[in-house]
Amino acid sequence: MSSKEQKTPNEQVSEEMENAAEQQVEATQETGEGVDPRVAELEAQLAAAVQRERESLLRAKAEVENIRRRTEQDVEKAHKFALEKFSAELLPVIDNLERALDTADKTNAELAAMIEGVELTLKSLLDAVGKYGIQVVSETNVPFNPEVHQAMTMLESADHEPNHVMMVMQKGYTLNGRLLRPAMVAVSKAKA
């Protein structure tokens, strides 16, 4: 294909108008005639039309670029958060394994192998979900952050600064920085 066939209709019209204007100006200059006011007016209109077409073309190119950029961002987000629903469904499984370990009788020698198996299963599950961007929110003695914490209660404490997480009742999780589930926490307040 030639370069003319690849151009958009706006570019072709714009170039044709420019060429016609240049030829008319050259013809007028060659003949040495004085410029007729009507010709000058038409040349001015032509120049204005050419300018409008250029601006319109630039706006169209900018709009296409914006659409392309937005589409790329949407695709990137879709890839990044495609596992969000699946990840949210795994959280109760993680919670149940942690509860099983918390309630297990660690002094019973007969249960030691089972407890070790549950611990290894939990560790391997946390490692697997961690590879895909899931992070645990379970820190204590950090300032309360309403973006990742859900305050279940406020307790007076001399040991903790006010508005700090004292205790985590249920761990929270994020997926690539987006909250999957807030951590349910007890928040400290100053003694009255």
From Swiss-Prot:
TM stretches of this protein: none
One of the protein's GO biological processes: protein folding
SUPFAM superfamilies xref list: Coiled-coil domain of nucleotide exchange factor GrpE, Head domain of nucleotide exchange factor GrpE
PROSITE patterns: GRPE (PS01071)
UniProt similarity note: Belongs to the GrpE family.
Assembly and interaction partners: Homodimer.
Protein name: Protein GrpE
